[in-house]
Amino acid sequence: MFKKIEAIFREEKLTVVKEALAAIGIVGMNVTEVRGHGHQGGIELAGRVGTYKVDLLPRIQLNIVLSDHNVEKTIETIQQAAQTDNIGDGIIFVYPVDQVVRIGTGERGYLALSYEGDIDMRQHVQMQAAD
C-alpha cells in the first residue's frame, strides 16, 4: 500500500531534486545531511602539506513515504534530477511501509500522507475531470 523511498545523492543536487519532485506533486519529505561512500571510495585532495584522502563524502539523504502507485515516477524523477553521469551520484532504496499515522490528528493511511496539491490529489482531480 505504501513505500518509503530513501535516496542518497550529492549535496549540490538537493535544490534540483526538490524542485523536480514538487513539479510532480511530491510535497512531503525529510532531508538529512549524511556522510558515506560506495564504489567511489572517497576522493584525494591536494593541500599545502600534500595529498590526503577523504573517504566519507558529504551527501543528502532524502526520505519520502508515498502510495505504491507513485513509486516508479518518483524514482525516475529523483534519478534524472540527481544524475551527473559521474561515479558517486548516489543510490535509491525502496522499503515497504506497513502503516502511517499522523501524530497530531491520528489520521491513518492515505489521509496521514495527503497534502493540498500532492501527487495523489492531482491524480484524483485529473480522473474526475476525465469523467
Regions found by a protein language model. Give the residues of each.
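Positively charged, small/polar-rich N-terminal and surface patches that mediate targeting and assembly
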Residues: M1-D131
